[in-house]
Design a protein with these regions (language model features):
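Charge-dense, helix-prone N-terminal extensions
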Residues: 1-117
Length: 117
């Protein structure tokens, strides 16, 4: 996948907007960041805000695609996505999960995107 793919999928989520944080494009719902793009000279990455258990599941299911962000943010669930290695359904799932974690409960319910636990 590419930066353009990441952006397109993120912005397709309800009420998602693009902004910037620390010089990187980010994607927000209700003013809160759920994903960030991390373009680099050698390889492009994205970041999704997952819960620690969700992070563990993505990392275990897709080794070489997902990895925790270094430091405290990573321990809280911030997860890097190697864009060249991820497929569209997996990227969409990660972005949707991050959006569901971040969006207000009312918006999640209205969207019909909530997954039964």
């Amino acid at each position: 996948m590419t930066i353009a793919d990441f952006r397109r999928i993120a912005l397709a989520l309800p009420h998602a907007t693009e902004s910037a944080h620390m010089g990187h494009p980010d994607f927000r719902v209700n003013g809160k960041i759920f994903a960030t793009l991390l373009p680099r000279d050698d390889e492009d990455w994205g970041m999704v805000n997952l819960k620690p258990e969700q992070q563990r599941q993505f990392v275990e299911a897709h080794p070489g695609v997902f990895e925790p962000v270094k430091g405290g943010w990573g321990r809280r669930g911030a997860t890097q996505v190697r864009l060249r290695a991820v497929d569209k359904p997996t990227l969409r799932s990660a972005l949707l999960t991050a959006w569901l974690n971040t969006a207000p409960k009312r918006l999640v319910e209205e969207s019909g995107l909530a997954v039964a636990e």
